[in-house]
């Protein structure tokens, strides 16, 4: 099947009598309620459930193995190949399925807040609530932009269409397929809305580096003087909490590009975790959940329609989707200058990494590639040993290219723009998990404040004798002994054993990067 035929099929779908194009937020909310896809909560948000898929389904994600990209993609467990034949046949079936629907919902918008690099996209949805979701998550066009909008990538989403693995070449009924040649994302079998958001991010992680733009899985904010900070970190490291600063404006909470002009948000909204959400802890997110926002898999009281953010009956991965303008203290459009400060956040449950350390360019590239944090394995059975988790570039599931490409670009940009990089441990101190305690949030905030102000750039440091990190000897508002992790352990020998154990896990993980330069390994990694 040719690309021409594919485009004809899509053209027919987009121009069918059932196509509802660019409905407003109130219209979409009405459709959601009329079609019984969700409920209205006490704050006016739409609440929807995603059925059995309450998170991303990485084993069901594929990239079509096409001649134009075959030698560019880092094929493997993350980027699984699927044949053009399988994709084409499944695509035709999905189009035929959607043509029969009473209504389809179509959103046209952009990914990328910098107008020089934005990607015009369109999304075809079987569900009205999914269309409301993409309306809030991507960048919405004004009337003039909509009139001239020509999509360069299309998401076709049919959650109720189930694949047959025996025929369709999939691993299950669910599928998320990207064809770079046909500029199509095909999603079916899963109702989890995050698949649409992350598919576009994966696409941008392929397209932006080709324009010499580093795509990044991070949050970012900007100070009153125009100083920009990036926060990288895996789930549970405090990225959202620490980047929400009343004295700084939010550029974005999750996906960014770094071009020759500076930093820009890829999205037009936020997709925030809301497990245990409270107004006291995270007022910005709490107050954003209002009319037009979408709650995903949050338990709602049947009578009062009040959301119970502590109830994880459906999943711990409860989410809220809302547009950037739903929160105060933001930059619009979501663009800013070059980063002055880059923070890598890790929650080290072994309690051996310093609470803050300065990184050289090589160390920054090493820790960027490593993407380390801890997961607590088996705590429900009383097992207290933490499990080291490494997610390349703090975003392994979304990187189509070889990881070294992103690391090299980061190194070049750090050097060119003299960005200062810090590794911040928000995990344990005074011992590993079960012995020590979680790092004091007030201390972490003080350390980040000192990094952002430029104070730590000139601070006196001591080299960590196992990890080779430069640890500040003094940070205002933080006891000096807290800065040196060994000093917080009662058993100094036990600290050394645990630190060497973690250093070895870093080294073992790094063996997979066979295309990385020797300088990054020799100058960036542990020294013991």
From Swiss-Prot:
GO cellular-component term (any): cytosol
Domain of life assignment: Bacteria
Source organism per UniProt: Bacillus mycoides (strain KBAB4) (Bacillus weihenstephanensis)
One GO molecular-function entry: phosphoenolpyruvate carboxykinase (ATP) activity
Cofactor(s) this protein requires: Mn(2+)
Residues that bind substrate: 56, 192, 198, 319
InterPro entries reported for this sequence: PEP_carboxykinase_ATP, PEP_carboxykinase_C, PEP_carboxykinase_N, PEPCK_ATP_CS
Note on how the cofactor is bound: Binds 1 Mn(2+) ion per subunit.
The enzyme's E.C. designation: 4.1.1.49
Top EC class for this record: lyase
Alphabetical keyword list: ATP-binding, Cytoplasm, Decarboxylase, Gluconeogenesis, Lyase, Manganese, Metal-binding, Nucleotide-binding
Homology family: Belongs to the phosphoenolpyruvate carboxykinase (ATP) family.
SUPFAM superfamilies reported for this sequence: PEP carboxykinase N-terminal domain, PEP carboxykinase-like
Pathway as given in its UniProt record: Carbohydrate biosynthesis; gluconeogenesis
Gene Ontology BP, a term: gluconeogenesis
Cellular compartments annotated: Cytoplasm
Reactions catalysed according to its record: oxaloacetate + ATP = phosphoenolpyruvate + ADP + CO2
Role, per record: Involved in the gluconeogenesis. Catalyzes the conversion of oxaloacetate (OAA) to phosphoenolpyruvate (PEP) through direct phosphoryl transfer between the nucleoside triphosphate and OAA.
Protein name: Phosphoenolpyruvate carboxykinase (ATP)
Gene, per the UniProt record: pckA
UniProt: Mn(2+) binding residues: 198, 217, 254
Residues bound to ATP: 198, 217, 233-241, 282, 319, 444
